[in-house]
Design a protein with these regions (language model features):
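Residue-level signal for functionally critical sites in structured catalytic/ligand-binding pockets
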Residues: 3-4, 24, 44
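First exposed extracellular module after export/assembly in secreted or surface-exposed proteins
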Residues: 28-133
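Sec-dependent bacterial lipoprotein signal peptides
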Residues: 1-19
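Bacterial Sec-dependent N-terminal signal peptides
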Residues: 13-37
Length: 133
């Protein structure tokens, strides 16, 4: 009986550690800090963000995108997905640091006015200061 209890405990601990490792690896994918710039501050949080960091996975962003309203073309940009948590104090042209954030819940009311944005959308968390390595 003791052997059966010991074996069951060992299995549970192994499964628990495996889950922790998988969770840790997923978090590592989104833990890098990047530098970006708010390129367009369109109405109703239709924001376009440019990537300034060389270590960013550019497959997550639009390689090139043209704003239909101005005709200006941007490189390595994405649409803001985290509309509820993006600081209002950041204006077009401002540079800031951010991490990718797939965990934040975005349940705020946002108006439906349209302004063109890139086809790729990312949720981010703006950092208080420069990235710490």
């Amino acid at each position: 009986m003791k052997i059966l209890l010991l074996a069951a405990s060992l299995v549970l601990l192994t499964v628990k550690e495996d889950c922790k490792k998988k969770k840790g690896n997923a978090a590592a994918n989104f833990s890098s800090c990047y530098k970006g710039r708010l390129e367009i501050k369109g109405g109703c949080m239709n924001y376009t963000i440019g990537i300034l960091s060389s270590n960013f996975d550019t497959s997550l962003a639009a390689a090139t995108w043209t704003d239909d309203n101005t005709g200006k073309t941007y490189k390595n940009v994405f649409a803001l997905g985290s509309k509820c948590t993006f600081p209002e104090s950041i204006n077009a042209g401002d540079e800031f640091y951010f991490t990718l954030d797939s965990t934040s819940v975005q349940n705020c009311a946002v108006c439906l006015m349209y302004y063109p944005v890139p086809p790729k959308r990312l949720s981010i968390k703006v950092m208080q200061g420069p990235c710490q390595q």
